[in-house]
Amino acid sequence: MSERLLVLVRHGQSEWNLKNLFTGWKDPDLTAQGVSEAKDAGRKLKAHGLSFDVAFTSELTRAQHTLKLILDELGQPGLPTSKNLALNERDYGDLSGLNKDDARAKWGEEQVHVWRRSYDVPPPGGESLKDTLARALPYYVQEILPGVLNGQRTLVAAHGNSLRALIMVLEKLTPEGILKRELATGVPIIYRLKADSTVESKLDLAG
């Protein structure tokens, strides 16, 4: 029986993560630490004896760069890769590019907290987590999952909120449950799935 392997990894630290800015669909690259995190992710996957048949990523540089560095570490630089905006980070709209402390000063700490941590309240001109899930989930179900179930060993390098969409369906989490889930930068999560697409095992390679 072929292995139903799905590995998710959030991009390494970006320049705007470091500066405490809302990033969303803005396109900063990785910091030196982010590069190191991505390479380390590749080394960890290699140490677990993993290789892949296909990869998916977003249309944003920080996720694509993370994927490239991981594949280089695995010795798979030419792996077939699909890039799609469905896997892009949540669009923070008018908050994009703002320092998080400055945003709190402008709109108030409580309002910014609602935009960041509620499930269905978007910031001005942006997306809620629910909106992000509405584009990421169909892409997962239609484009990623069928290959996994057919034995394609699959790697997804994306963003905290788009990966939350995949984790929500994989782990059958409620909106409240997924809001509490924090994803560290550059840390692979290894899922092995059953034939019915539910999770057989999960291994988080943190540390």
From Swiss-Prot:
One Pfam match: His_Phos_1
Catalysed reactions, semicolon-separated: (2R)-2-phosphoglycerate = (2R)-3-phosphoglycerate
Enzyme Commission number(s): 5.4.2.11
Catalytic center residues: 11 (tele-phosphohistidine intermediate), 89 (proton donor/acceptor)
UniProt-annotated site: Transition state stabilizer, residues: 159
SUPFAM superfamilies noted in UniProt: Phosphoglycerate mutase-like (SSF53254)
Keywords: Gluconeogenesis, Glycolysis, Isomerase
Pathway in which the depicted protein is active: Carbohydrate degradation; glycolysis; pyruvate from D-glyceraldehyde 3-phosphate: step 3/5
GO molecular function: phosphoglycerate mutase activity
Top EC class for this record: isomerase
Domain of life: Bacteria
Residue numbers binding substrate: 10-17, 23-24, 62, 89-92, 100, 116-117, 160-161
NCBIfam families on file: pgm_1, PRK01295.1
Xref: HAMAP family: PGAM_GpmA (MF_01039)
Protein known as: 2,3-bisphosphoglycerate-dependent phosphoglycerate mutase
